[in-house]
Amino acid sequence: MEYGTIQDAVAETGLVVRGGFHPGAEDGVPGGAETVVLVGNAGPAMWDAFAAATGPGDRKDGPNPLDDWTRGVLAPVAGALGARALYPFEGPPYFPFQRWALRTGGVHVSPIGPLIDPEFGLWHAYRGALAFDQRLEVPDLGSHLSPCESCAEKPCLDTCPVGAFGPREDPEAPAPYD
């Protein structure tokens, strides 16, 4: 199967392919998958598709409507492509999507901690993954440089008014706000 075929099938849902990798035992991918392709949102297409959703399985009245919608659109794509759908919101145990994202080479750790996308900054997310039993060719996204490398001022480090990002004595406690 071609990577472009996966991209096209995922794009029809409003989601986008966010990169792929060939997992090792340390990656915690179940079922002996040879290739994992991450799926998520970057840009407005997912939100437009979610807002327009009205079919069965697109419940917007449940406790987790975006998760329900994601399952409703990604599971059929996985089935059609011969893959298994994995989700970051199912668990415990939870799949290590942040580590998987770093494995694709397409995102970087920002100075404040969250992963940053070279094109969309912090405005991106991972909604699922497609696990394939066969080894597929995936593009090397490692050449995408972090936008933080060329940002000398790093305003993100002191922009948050409550200091929610960065080290604190008790990381579980809410950030203080004066």
Task: Label every model-predicted segment.
Residues 1-178:
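Non-ligating segments of multi-cofactor redox enzymes
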